[in-house]
Amino acid sequence: MDFREILLIASKGQGVNHVPKRYSLAVGPPKKDPKVKGVQSAAVQAFLRRKEEELRQKALEEKKRKEELVKKRIELKHDKKARAMAKRTKDNFHGYDGIPVEEKTKKKQLVESHLNQGTDQEYDVEEEDFIDYNQAELDQDYEEEQEPPKAESKPKAPLKSAPSPMNFTDLLRLAEKKQFEPVEIKVVKKAEDRPLTAEELREREFLERKHRKKKPEPDAKLPPPVLKKAPSHKDIMGTKPSRGAGDRQLASKGLPFPQAEKKFRPSTASEKQAALSSPKSLPGERTKVGSGSSTQPSLREGHNRPVFNGAGKPRPSTCSPSVPKTPASGTQKSASEHKAKKPLPSHPSHSKPGPTVLSHNKSKSPGVRQPGSNSGSAPGQPNPGTARPTLSSGPVPRRQNGSSSSGPEQSAGGIRKLASNSHLSGRTLNGTNGPGRPASSSSGPGRPISGSAGSGRPVGSSGGPGQPVNNPHDLRRPMNSLSSPGRAVSGPGRSISGSIPAGRTVNSGPGRPVSSLGPGRAVSNPGLPTKPRCTVVSETISSKNIISRSSNGQINGMKPLLSGYRSAQGPQRLPFPTGYKRPREYEEDDDDEYDSEMDDFIEDEGEPQEEISKHIREIFGYDRKKYKDESDYALRYMESSWKEQQKEEAKSLRLGMQEDLEEMRREEEELKRRKAKKLKRH
């Protein structure tokens, strides 16, 4: 085909085939990924990428920080070691005798100390609580040590493998579903961190104690802190043998009778009669009162029995030369002693080493005397129960256990007076006999010691020859009647019955000198039976005063006075505590100073309680009704944390500032008003 023909063909078809080009209106295939309604996939992907990046970054930072810390730690360890070695000077100290000293842990020391403690030791309540507390700590530590192995022993649950990552399209679908669902935020309940109230504290304490008691504590056997409750009224009035037995045990153990002062000495007329008749035996030991009206049983109850001091050792009694036998001899029992025994069930005074009571005194309640402290507590012997040495260790052979034969009192022909024996200045009152109790009667404040208990006759040994028993009313003075007010110490050897309750003469007659034979014995008048006077000692006397007094013991080392004399001098008196000053009354000064700022102070004297409450409610928003059920105990011991207190402080500070601002604003307004008034006037 030649070129010319081709051109012709082309020119022919040129107009026919020529169609102008236009943009296509047809919808092409979508260029983007199919969209899921409402979720922008690109945004989600970007978010995920960002998260991954952040996590990677955090992990890197953590790693770096750990490395730095490890480096520092290693340095610190080296430094510490170096410092410790530099400080230590006795690194190689192996004890003075070459045996290395074994350092015991605190826990071991505590346990050992428990084991070493004897059962007969006396503990204060505080000490016992402390040991309980330590024991509880030990138990806790022990439990904590035992718990970790339990935790390890549990088989570990196999770790759940992480779920396989979701496909991206599935993730988008899930997002579409979840996007309108509300997100549940779990509120972590905070344990209420409020301070406990007193009741809750008490309850918790009680439960802890209960829990502690359940665990046996074989190593620490402590004596119960309180040996005996105060006797009930029945116990006081009726003398019961069972009580006596308890006291006997106490005495033998050497424990002091804690309630000694609170027990009273009941006495019955019949007992007095028996006591008085007992002197028939052993004439040598019997002493007649000057008046001869009544003789006193020379035999003390424990006369022929060995007297034990609280610790259980027989205490030798220094019998006077006139009496051939010591109480420990136990050989001669006379009819009088049998008689003396009759009242015994009422109180085992014989078990007490120091019943210096005449046999008619037997009716005293057992607890009255602490072991070894005769009412005149044996001079020169430590009262074992009280653990205080009785001070007047005077040379006079006085009866050391009040229970020794009457003879001791007649020592040296009865010349020596038991004046010092009668509790010089209240020394060696029964151990607990505090300053507030009459010295001579350990039984209770102001009760005469005499066997008749309330009858107002002095017990022989305690009363001293003709010494009046302490003024029963004179609760606060432990001295002999000498020091007790209102009583004249009349003449040598005379006891004036002046303040003795029933108005009775202490000796056979108020004015009569006791014959020198029976120096220590005031003869009780048998014919005057009256009810024992019971006075309760409400206060516990502090041991400080007792000790200070006891140092005075034998009236500053004077020899015991002869029967003719009675020392009414100071040492027998309890020194007045110097630290004590009477509160002065300042009421007179109240009106002197006038404070202008106090004008707006709310004085609620005249107003009823509701008015006051109203004021308080207005000022503080305080409602008394909310707190009316709170006991004083609860309010006093309510627990409060530092945080709570800070809140309260902040609150009160805020209120205070607001009030100050208001005050200032009011003052400014007041000033403005005054200025305005002045301007108006002018």
Curated annotation (Swiss-Prot):
Membrane spanning stretches: none
Keywords for this protein: Acetylation, Coiled coil, DNA-binding, Isopeptide bond, Nucleus, Phosphoprotein, Transcription, Transcription regulation, Ubl conjugation
Family per similarity comment: Belongs to the SPT2 family.
GO terms (BP aspect): heterochromatin formation; nucleosome assembly; regulation of DNA-templated transcription
Annotated Polar residues bias: 267-280, 317-334, 371-393, 400-409, 419-432
Pfam families in the record: SPT2 (PF08243), SPT2_N (PF22878)
Residues carrying Phosphoserine: S277, S596
Gene this protein is translated from: Spty2d1
Region (Disordered): 80-170, 187-533, 549-595, 641-682
InterPro entries in UniProt: Chromatin_SPT2, SPT2_N
Basic residues biased stretches: 673-682
Compartments (UniProt record): Nucleus, Nucleolus
Subunit structure, as described in the record: Interacts with histones. Interacts with a heterotetrameric complex formed by histone H3 and H4, especially when the histone tetramer is not bound to DNA. Interacts with histone H3.3.
Coiled coil: 46-82, 642-682
Presence of keyword Glycosyltransferase: no
Placement of covalent cross-link Glycyl lysine isopeptide (Lys-Gly) (interchain with G-Cter in SUMO2): K37, K186
Modified residues (N6-acetyllysine): K581
Keyword Translocase tagged: no
Organism classification: Eukaryota, Metazoa, Chordata, Craniata, Vertebrata
Protein name as annotated: Protein SPT2 homolog
Biased composition, class Acidic residues, residue ranges: 121-131, 586-595
Stretches with biased composition (Low complexity): 156-165, 435-460, 490-504
